[in-house]
């Protein structure tokens, strides 16, 4: 599975604590290797086609779109803000 990150995603990621940035790298690598791993808490977003979320840390989520075999990450943030 290929992984891509938008410029917006990278800007938001850079603003997060270093520990969250490191966990994000681990979770994205895990997604590329095993999308069904239970620690990802992989979920389809109900109101959007081909849009999913994974848990980065207890309160952080990364949002991405699936296009064939590519995950395009476009949002990351605290769970209370990222779904807006």
What are these regions (language model features)?
Residues 30-54:
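A short, surface-exposed loop/turn module that caps and links secondary-structure elements
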Residues 4-8, 14, 27, 45-47, ...:
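Basic nucleic-acid-binding interfaces
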Residues 27-30, 79:
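Conserved short hydrophobic interaction patches
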């Amino acid at each position: 599975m290929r992984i891509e990150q938008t410029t917006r995603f990278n800007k938001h990621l850079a603003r997060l604590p270093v520990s969250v940035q490191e966990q994000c790298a681990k979770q994205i690598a895990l997604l590329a290797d095993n999308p069904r791993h239970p620690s990802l808490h992989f979920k389809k977003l109900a109101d959007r086609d081909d849009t999913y979320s994974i848990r980065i840390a207890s309160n952080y989520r990364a949002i991405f779109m699936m296009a064939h075999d590519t995950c395009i990450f476009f949002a990351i943030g605290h769970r209370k803000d990222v779904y807006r």
